[in-house]
């Protein structure tokens, strides 16, 4: 009922889902109207659920260092960032809780670059994804796109 009211007001929202628990939590969150999923780790290996999120252009807010600290993946080698990028999900890199994780976006990007062979092109794509799924006005997004375009040159 509450999510219905939020949708009626056209307020975008994120639901933390899939950090632990099943992929069904993610699917339920999207069905409730979430336009972004915090973490989304449970999508790992779930081709139909990945397609479901991709087709609906759901942002996947990955928090690599936090996910390592909380052991959201049993084996850090299985962290699904490359899987999600290769599936063309709208992956973004996030800090989760900077003060708890003692991290910054710079540290997050350095970690995934070193540990998961994330390329500069993928970093740029994730930054573009962040602009695309941002809960910001069109004017703010336009300013960000211009900065991004300048940065790429």
Task: List the model feature ranges, each with a label.
Residues 1-15, 19-35, 44-58, 75-90, ...:
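Histidine/acidic residue-rich metal-binding segments in metalloenzymes
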């Amino acid at each position: 009922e509450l999510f219905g009211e939020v949708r009626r007001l056209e307020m975008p929202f994120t639901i933390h889902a899939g950090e632990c628990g099943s992929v069904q939590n993610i699917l339920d969150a999207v069905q409730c109207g979430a336009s972004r999923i915090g973490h989304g780790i449970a999508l790992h290996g779930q081709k139909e659920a990945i397609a479901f999120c991709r087709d609906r252009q759901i942002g996947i807010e990955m928090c690599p260092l936090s996910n390592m600290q909380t052991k959201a993946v049993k084996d850090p080698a299985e962290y699904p960032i490359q899987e999600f990028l290769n599936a063309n999900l709208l992956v973004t890199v996030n800090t989760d809780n900077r003060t708890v994780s003692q991290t910054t976006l710079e540290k997050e990007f350095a970690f995934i670059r070193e540990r998961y062979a994330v390329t500069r092109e993928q970093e740029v794509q994730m930054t573009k994804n962040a602009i695309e799924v941002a809960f910001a006005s069109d004017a703010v997004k336009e300013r960000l796109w211009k900065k991004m375009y300048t940065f790429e040159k």
